Amino acid sequence: MPREDRATWKSNYFLKIIQLLDDYPKCFIVGADNVGSKQMQQIRMSLRGKAVVLMGKNTMMRKAIRGHLENNPALEKLLPHIRGNVGFVFTKEDLTEIRDMLLANKVPAAARAGAIAPCEVTVPAQNTGLGPEKTSFFQALGITTKISRGTIEILSDVQLIKTGDKVGASEATLLNMLNISPFSFGLIIQQVFDNGSIYNPEVLDITEDTLHSRFLEGVRNVASVCLQIGYPTVASVPHSIINGYKRVLALSVETEYTFPLAEKVKAFLADPSAFVAAAPVAAASTAAPAAAAAAPAKVEAKEESEESDEDMGFGLFD
């Protein structure tokens, strides 16, 4: 490619990334390891109208951003995260929705020898369908097996590869023999940039319910601390009032001092049997109307059954 064309392409790329950074207030920094051109094309098509994917050399992306810092100083937060095989996904839509679309575009992939495992791989207990001649292969990997109807059967689940481990040739061969594609590759969100703020993608998993529960937990902690040190706050005052009322009530019971709300408690302590006797009476009074309502229903049901008997012909010779 001639130097002039290359220079023109670079200039257009700089203009494009600057325009995208100005037009879109939100973007993802995504890792693109093991993502092929065909899969990238499918991702672009699925995001069409909702987001724009931009890939490029890290040096060019950094240079374009540094040249635009005068107009938008917040972009400097992106620079430390532009390393490795990364790109941008720009959007104006809900970030969680775009995240879910990226996850939906992951494709299963077979294990390759020498690759770094992005997740844990467990081989489930199963009949492999492989002949007995492969027994030594399983023994070398420490997998307990038995011969069942002329084929090898794995007796229990086996953790074959841990996250971050390098896939060995034997592990890759076994997974391929069992037709297991343990990995899935796609654009992996590494950082989220939202209106000048940058944060981890785990923040997108925080829902309103999560915020509500954490807020209530914080209120409870504040109330507990304030009660212990005797410092009144909005969170602790209701508990302080209740505790104070309990103390006054206890003092009233132990002394001759009384007030209207304490009279019932004193009466109960003086004669608990009176309250026990009153409980069945109250229960009976509530049960009586229910029984009265049920009685006509039973009579009605009986009359209906007699009528149905007559309809069936049981009174034919009466």
From Swiss-Prot:
The modification Phosphotyrosine is found at residue 24. It is found in: Nucleus; Cytoplasm. It holds the Pfam family Ribosomal_60s. The modification Phosphoserine is found at residues 305, 308. Residues 298-318 are annotated as: Disordered. There is a cross-link at residue 298 (Glycyl lysine isopeptide (Lys-Gly) (interchain with G-Cter in SUMO2)). Residues 303-312 have a biased composition (Acidic residues). The modification Phosphothreonine is found at residue 59. Keywords: Cytoplasm, Isopeptide bond, Nucleus, Phosphoprotein, Ribonucleoprotein, Ribosomal protein, Ubl conjugation. Ubiquitinated at Lys-264 by RNF14 and RNF25 in response to ribosome collisions (ribosome stalling). GO terms for molecular function: large ribosomal subunit rRNA binding; structural constituent of ribosome. GO terms for cellular component: cytoplasmic ribonucleoprotein granule; cytosolic large ribosomal subunit; endoplasmic reticulum; nucleus; postsynaptic density. GO terms for biological process: cytoplasmic translation; ribosomal large subunit assembly. There is a cross-link at residue 264 (Glycyl lysine isopeptide (Lys-Gly) (interchain with G-Cter in ubiquitin)). There is a cross-link at residue 298 (Glycyl lysine isopeptide (Lys-Gly) (interchain with G-Cter in SUMO1)). Its main location: nucleus. The keyword Transmembrane helix does not apply. Belongs to the universal ribosomal protein uL10 family. P0 forms a pentameric complex by interaction with dimers of P1 and P2. Identified in a IGF2BP1-dependent mRNP granule complex containing untranslated mRNAs. Interacts with APEX1. Interacts with FMR1 isoform 6. Ribosomal protein P0 is the functional equivalent of E.coli protein L10. This is Large ribosomal subunit protein uL10. It comes from Oryctolagus cuniculus. The gene is RPLP0.
